Amino acid sequence: MYAIIKTGGKQYKVEKGVSLVVEKLKGVEAGQEVILREVLLLADGEKLTVGKPIIESARVVAKVVSQKRGPKVLVFKRKPKKGYKKLQGHRQYVTELEITGINT
């Protein structure tokens, strides 16, 4: 059984026991359980359920493993012939989840 969920403006294919990194979820701490309600699709063997746009009765339960920062993204600006250079870095906050169950 797998599901397609939407969180942080992105869609993820999840199964029980899978861990994934999503955009930061506010107000949660490591070890806490979260319920993801935006389930777009459910697949269980032969049966496939597609939401319009979401499946109201479906829930995905996940455990927060950690809140951390993602990899550094470097932004480099340069103007030709003028010697202007600017290097800037950015690290986005992310939440690591482990899927514990899919409820239909």
Curated annotation (Swiss-Prot):
Domain of life of the organism encoding this protein: Bacteria
Record's GO cellular component terms: cytoplasm; ribonucleoprotein complex; ribosome
Subunit composition and interactions: Part of the 50S ribosomal subunit. Contacts protein L20.
Lineage: Bacteria, Pseudomonadati, Elusimicrobiota, Endomicrobiia, Endomicrobiales
Presence of the UniProt keyword Membrane in the record: no
Pfam families according to UniProt: Ribosomal_L21p
Sorted UniProt keywords: Ribonucleoprotein, Ribosomal protein, RNA-binding, rRNA-binding
Keyword Translocase: no
Native source species: Endomicrobium trichonymphae
HAMAP family assigned to the protein according to its UniProt record, in alphabetical order: Ribosomal_bL21
Name of the featured protein: Large ribosomal subunit protein bL21
Alphabetized GO MF terms: rRNA binding; structural constituent of ribosome
BP GO terms, sorted: translation
Task performed by this protein: This protein binds to 23S rRNA in the presence of protein L20.
Family: Belongs to the bacterial ribosomal protein bL21 family.
